[in-house]
Amino acid sequence: DRLAVVDTLGRHWPRILSEGWDFYMQPRWSRCGKHVAWISWNHPNMPWDGSVLQCGQVLVDGEVLPTLENAEALDGAGDVSVFQPEFSEDGTSLYYVSDREGFGQIWNVEIETGSRKQLTFGQEEYGQPAWVQDLRTYALIHNDEKALTIVNRAGFMRVCLIDLKNGAQEDLDSLSHFGDLSHLSISPDGLRVSAIASGGALASRLIGWDCPSGELETYLVAAQAPEAKALSKAEPMTYESAGGCLAHGIYYPPVGSVPGLEGPPPLLVIVHGGPT
C-alpha cells in the first residue's frame, strides 16, 4: 500500500505522501489542514496484532498537490495495536484507541511533544478488529470535551458518553436495547451521531442520536425481525479451558417447544476459528 493525495478536479496526477509500509488505513486530515495522521503495519501482522499511529506535517506549494514532512510514529509497535485516529478540534493532539495496556482504551497524544495520556480504563474494549477501512467506535462531541463511544463488555455492545476531562462515564439508556453497533459517525455540525445498530430482537437499522436532546431516531430498518417470543436471548459465559486459560462464549438457551421431542433439547456448539 501507499498513502496518497488526489486532486478531485483531475488537474494533477496523485502524489504519494508515504510509502514503505505493507499496509495503510484510516488516514485523517486535521481540521486546520496542517497535519495528516494514519495507521500503518507490516506483514505478517494484522492491524489488531501490531500497528503504528503516524503523523506528518502538510506542505503546500502553490497549486501543486501537498507533500508531507517530519512524519513520525506517535504510538504502536509490533505487539501494540492502534485504531481510529481523530484530531482534536485545535489540531494539536490526536485521540485514538490503543491496546497498550491490554484492552483497547481511548488515548490522547500531543503531536508536538509526543506526550500520551490514557483516558479510559477497565476491562472493556473501545476498539474493534479493523477488518476493513474506516471502522469507527467513537465520536468526539461538545468541542472534544466528551466522546460518544461504543464499548464492548463481555461481547455485548453498549453506547457510553465519556467526559474526556475527568473520565466520568454514563451509559445511554435510550440505546441500551441494542446489542451490536458499528460505523459511528458524527454530523459536520457536531449535533447528531449516526450508527448501524441491531439487537437480539431488533433487525439491523440506521439510527441517529441527537446530542443536545438525547432523542433517538430510526432512519431505515433492513428487515423485519421475527416475533420476540421466538428468539433466544443471548447470555455471556466464561469457563476454564486447556492450560488454565479462560475461554469466553455466548450461550443461547432454548425457547419454545418442538412437538414430539422428549428429554432436553440438543446443545449445538459453534467454535470461532479466528484469527480474532
Task: Report the location of each language-model feature.
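Non-catalytic accessory segments flanking enzyme active sites
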Residues: 1-3, 25-26, 120, 133-136, ...
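Conserved beta-strand position repeated across blades of beta-propeller domains
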Residues: 28, 86, 139-140, 185
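Residue-level detector of Asp-centered blade-edge/turn motifs that repeat once per structural unit
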Residues: 31-32, 89-90, 142-143, 188-189
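A flexible loop/linker signature enriched in serine peptidases of the S9 family
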Residues: 1-3, 18-24, 37-55, 73-82, ...
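Beta-propeller fold detector
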Residues: 15-18, 64-73, 116-123, 170-174, ...
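Short beta-strand element of the alpha/beta-hydrolase
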Residues: 262-273
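Short loop/turn segments that connect beta-strands within beta-propeller blades
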Residues: 7-10, 58-61, 110-114, 163-167, ...
